[in-house]
Amino acid sequence: MILPKGKARVGSLLADRTEAGSDGSGMLYGFDYSCGLQATLAICDGFVRAVRLHGSTTGSSIFPARNEPASIPETALVPSNASARVSAMPQNGLRVLVTGASGPIGAALLPSLKASGYQVTRFVRGQPSSEGQIQWDPSQPIAAELVSGFDAAIHLAGETIVGRWTDDKRARVRDSRTLGTRHLAQALAHAKKPPRVFISGSAIGFYGDRGDEILREDSAPGQGFLADVCQEWEAAARPAKDAGIRTANLRTGLVLSADGGALPKMLPPFKFGLGGRLGSGRQWWSWIHVQDLVGAMHHIMKSDLIEGPVNGVAPGPVTNGEFTKTLGSVLSRPTIFPVPEFALALALGRDASKELLLSSQRVEPALLVASGYPFHYSELKKALQAILR
């Protein structure tokens, strides 16, 4: 591929920033064994109710060890002077379409967009209850005129993965993502006035269970139900890309927020000193503070050359054991009650417990770092302190 003038591969830019000493700055659980297995399963169920596919299984430096050079697909390009080449896209009056805005990510995103001067329109499943809402059914095609005239579209909608993974449940999880994304992407592609950028949700579940391997945007997909769904999810956004719309697939990690998601569900047992690691605790968890995830979306909208897969994680992944100890430290509580794998399997089923809680994904936000996104929270302890204190 011939690189346009003024552009450089992310891999090259990342190497430049690393040599300069840049650090890229500038699910969970709770189990109470004292109450027996029934309480354990109940708490586990509470945790899973906090996890959605777009943010489920999912420091100081980008990673504790860097034994391999960063390399990013040629389709993911950023300018060699990234900070100076962020587009001066005027924000006041820009129209943004958002789906899936009722979750903790959307709850943080919407006020942020409005505070920045964007005009926000939401696609909602139920009857519209206020101005700026449009009813839609993700399983049905969307009229192109409904999505015409927007400057950006952010697609976060998808069926929750709560519950055991029966065949019917798997189908709903898959179809809500692939059909909804495909129908939206096709409508955007045929719109008379299509958006300049389409940010479509995905998840680091794309990578599967990878042990200690460092995972970047160009890493191969993994195996398993979630990995398969994520691959189909990203492919479903292709009609927008093929129509010339800049399309980014935001592979979100574990989102930390005080207003929803996994963290509030896991706090009660930890506050009582009953928290502990899951299984061996050696599995890597790649997390991100919700403020940084929202900031990353703003960054993608403004940075004209960011496209393709984008890892929505902080540059400081930790093992589950480290996460457990850090949370206990922030709460000033012990973390001495580990949860065995069999308890997770009893609560969720073997496949769901393995993919949601025990899979290891050590993910690096190579593209966000290389394109100059200034993370507010690169260290887990500071992120948890900001949320909990």
Label every model-predicted segment.
Residues 202, 235-258:
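Conserved beta-loop-beta element that borders a ligand/cofactor-binding pocket
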Residues 231, 243-245, 256-265, 300-310:
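Glycine/proline-rich active-site loop of Rossmann-fold NAD(P)-dependent oxidoreductases
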Residues 182-224:
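Conserved Rossmann-fold NAD(P)-dependent oxidoreductase catalytic core, especially the SDR/UDP-sugar
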Residues 128, 132-180:
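NAD(P)H-binding glycine-rich loop region in Rossmannoid oxidoreductase-like domains
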Residues 96-115:
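N-terminal Rossmann NAD(P)H-binding glycine-rich loop of SDR-like oxidoreductase domains
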Residues 79, 83-90, 94, 355-389:
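C-terminal amphipathic/interface module of NAD(P)-dependent oxidoreductases
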Residues 88-90, 303-351, 385-389:
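Mid/C-terminal beta-alpha module of Rossmann-like enzyme folds, strongest
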